[in-house]
Amino acid sequence: MAHVAIMIRIIPSENRNMYFRMIQDSNTTFKVEMGRVGAAPYIRYYPISVWDKMYQKKISEGYQDKTELMDVHSSYTYKEIEDDSVRELISFLQQESSMAIKSNYSVSVSEVSPQMITQAEDILNQFSNDPLKDNSLLEQLFALLPRKMKNVADYLLPADAESEQIQNVIDRETDLLRMMETQMQALPSNDSKEKTLLEEWNLSITPVNNEKELRQIKRHMGHSADCFSKAFRVKNSNRDNAFWNYYDKHNYHKEDIHYWYHGSRNMNCLSILHNGLILNPKAPKVGHMFGYGIYLAPKAKKSIGYTSLKGSCWVHGTSDKAYLFVMKTVYKSPYHVYTWTSGMKSLTKSRISPHDAVFAHAGTSLRNDEVVIFDDAQVTLQYIIELKTIETQNGRE
């Protein structure tokens, strides 16, 4: 078997994010590819007799060997999704996720192994819970999954980082890692030709064509229905099972079920379809306005502000097409908040007990009502709504 060695070195102070690959290409020679991550490699050839010497030299210079974490995925395909609109939806979301990965990482999904994902999650959890927010942990993360960075320092935290900056970095890396993991889980295997990707994921997505149901969806959206393009009913078996088990265990009733909105960028939507809205049990419990939870909105307008739709107020979207989730959630005794205080950043499931959700009312602290859930079993997917700008719907793209 041909020898391969893959090494990474990050030097933030010099804005250097370097890689060094050694690849045996014959019985007597090996090829070296080296350079800045994300740039075209500089290539040279050497006799195989100097392999060990060169390898040790690079390790002594501070390069980290990432070879064992690499995995090679075989090239297979999934069975085609029959419904045209559903196939188009999944294709678009895969493309959006793939583009985000390509613009942020210098490794492809096929070069990432489950071990790399697990190790990356461990590093991110260490960083999230480290009170000093040591940048060396971020450097380890960037070395494990090499990133495209024009200026490494831009991706690290300044010495005087505020809590919002810290949370933004954690959210950024969490979103990217979930995207990478979802794309990796979408790679077909040997028996994939017998299944669609949706079947592999225990996921059912069907277009909503019933006029009564469509009217109900639009009415619930209020003035935001102007952006409505189409809707799909989503059934994620894993999340649905967790939801109904929680529902039965806690003796909820039909009137305790609510349908609220959740908005996210296009690049995150495939991961949400696959995983649902899930909470990391190892994540820090502070940093968000009402603690670490699942944030939902009774009004579509608020959640649309977090989508990729052109003009979205919170993430400054630029896309003519975006997606909004309708989540089915259950609670019956919310903790009502009318005025926010800084101590609410550390709210948790146990701290609001015996209440089972936070309902933050619009007023002095918020423009719109907000609902926060601290147990992801209380939430499952109901619809994904396709949004389009009014100009696009009128054919003025």
Predicted regions and their residues:
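Segments that shape or occlude catalytic/ligand-binding pockets
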Residues: 13, 40, 44, 50-60, ...
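Intrinsically disordered, low-complexity terminal and linker regions
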Residues: 1-31, 36-45, 49-268, 373-397
